[in-house]
Amino acid sequence: MNEQGLSEKEIFSYLEDVKSEDTDYYRVLSSMCTHPHRIAVEAHRLFIEANLGDLGLFAGAHRLEKEVIRMLGELLHAQSVEIPSGEACESSVCGYLTTGGTESNIQAIRGMKNLVTEDGKKSGEILNIVVPESAHFSFDKVANMMGIEVKRASLDPEFRVDIASAESLIDANTIGLVGIAGNTEFGQVDPIEELSKLALENELFLHVDAAFGGFVIPFLEKPYSFDFKVPGVTSIAIDPHKMGLSTIPSGALLFRSPFFMDSLKVNTPYLTTKSQFTLTGTRSGASAAATYAVMKYLGREGYRKNVQYCMQLTTKLVKEARKFGFEPLIEPVMNVVDLRVPNPDIVREQLLKKFGWNVSITRNPRSLRLVLMPHNTARDIEEFLQDLRKVTTEL
């Protein structure tokens, strides 16, 4: 650290230089994040100092968090929604704002583990959860952090979890199941209703990772059952900083009832509240303000238009790609497309090296993974496909 302070001009000159190293979203077809809405940015700045880790000091930011959770609960068909106020939830469905899907997934599984061990069930055993092979890598972190075995169920031909496979993995030490509503690689929605039946029959918890799909599925033309309408669902992860167009970090975790939320409680004797239910202590009140602002500003109609736009791009990409002989692995469920191309790893490398396109690769099978986000345009799609054709022709 320098002894004497630098001038603002020097600092911001350096910051501008460094920022130029970041990739402009214009050439990004791999990220599930995008530019936050301008109103979210403005609201974020207004509450930049607010710390939701000390609710008594930042009652206004806390009020916004409660309102965001209420709106998310309505979106996910919760009957009534509240976040903890002090020691307990004030009504049936509880939740709080997280840093994103990883934290939400960790906390959901932590809650499962706490509940079964507090009740004296399965104590001393190596507990396990059953997740799809398509589950996010955050569940590997769960295994490492909590000493829980993560069993991976195989996928069906449409890349949804195979229910028979999931059922075969359940044993006496299984504490919960996980379903994905908009998985990262394929954009597919697992059969949550069937997982719910399996969970209820075996007295297991069921967590739904809708980090990406939570702001997409409710606005698709085709309906999917994935949320609290499904009786066995006990918790849901949803990320406003993805298709919700909020600022980073803005995630959320919702529980069906205080029973699940209470399992996360720790005492905080030196703060303005007696307890916390969160993983992190300090939390961004600015993210709560940003999410509140953009959800109120756009409303359901605005989000519906946002999803329609992305799905129009998705349809265009698939239609035009087929003209060049590139078929999708599956017909896209949402704004994620996986294209069958020869030597996808080499194609990905050449697309970046020669044309600056950022795309990614699915693991099994290997294919070119593309995410169509609000920052993309029809012109982007046309340019990308021309460049893709050039790269594959040269192989």
From Swiss-Prot:
InterPro entries: GrpII_AminoAcid_Decarb, MfnA, PyrdxlP-dep_de-COase, PyrdxlP-dep_Trfase, PyrdxlP-dep_Trfase_major, PyrdxlP-dep_Trfase_small. GO terms for molecular function: aspartate 1-decarboxylase activity; pyridoxal phosphate binding; tyrosine decarboxylase activity. It holds the Pfam family Pyridoxal_deC. Pathway: Cofactor biosynthesis; methanofuran biosynthesis; Cofactor biosynthesis; coenzyme A biosynthesis. GO terms for biological process: carboxylic acid metabolic process; coenzyme A biosynthetic process; methanofuran biosynthetic process. It comes from the Archaea. Keywords: Decarboxylase, Lyase, Pyridoxal phosphate. Gene3D superfamilies: Aspartate Aminotransferase, domain 1 (3.90.1150.10), Type I PLP-dependent aspartate aminotransferase-like (Major domain) (3.40.640.10). The modification N6-(pyridoxal phosphate)lysine is found at K242. Its EC number is 4.1.1.11, 4.1.1.25. Its cofactor is pyridoxal 5'-phosphate. It catalyses: L-tyrosine + H(+) = tyramine + CO2; L-aspartate + H(+) = beta-alanine + CO2. Belongs to the group II decarboxylase family. MfnA subfamily. Catalyzes the decarboxylation of L-tyrosine to produce tyramine for methanofuran biosynthesis. Can also catalyze the decarboxylation of L-aspartate to produce beta-alanine for coenzyme A (CoA) biosynthesis. This is Probable L-tyrosine/L-aspartate decarboxylase. It comes from Methanosarcina barkeri (strain Fusaro / DSM 804).
